[in-house]
Amino acid sequence: SRAAPPPGRMERHGGGMSPLVVIDYAHTPDALEKVLVAMRPAVADGRELVCVFGCGGDRDPGKRPVMGRVAARLADRVVVTTDNPRFEDPAAIAGAVAKGIVETGQRRWLLELDRAAAIAAAVHAAKPGDVVVVAGKGHETYQEVAGERRPFSDARVVDEALAGRSPA
């Protein structure tokens, strides 16, 4: 038997009559590429791989457009959102990510700075057979904003969004 991955690493939610949502801590270009490549075979024929992610503030700004390019190249749709903006402007962080997406010519992307709304929108728009990867925070139970740790759980938001989906 296979051991379950640790919380926040390839953590699966939904599937079956709902889209499969995978939460992963991937927060570097290499890690994001690996999780998207790993999940591509799970996408049903004719369905889509969706990537929801953001980049942390007060961290390497050079990786932001690179991560945008990785997501745009490997996912069918991309939703750019916040991660832990810390003391940086969330819109500026997302703008740097978006620059990388735009450079690829990918047109199927959107920007939603409210992480819960971004995750919910991606889950609600997804169909059975789609795979939604929610990357960047994984097991974290908070979001760091302006020196404050606010309670936040990707898993809770994903489960609430899946529970609130209309039947396919």
Question: Which residues does each PLM region occupy?
Answer:
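ATP-dependent carboxylate-amine ligase
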Residues: 1-168
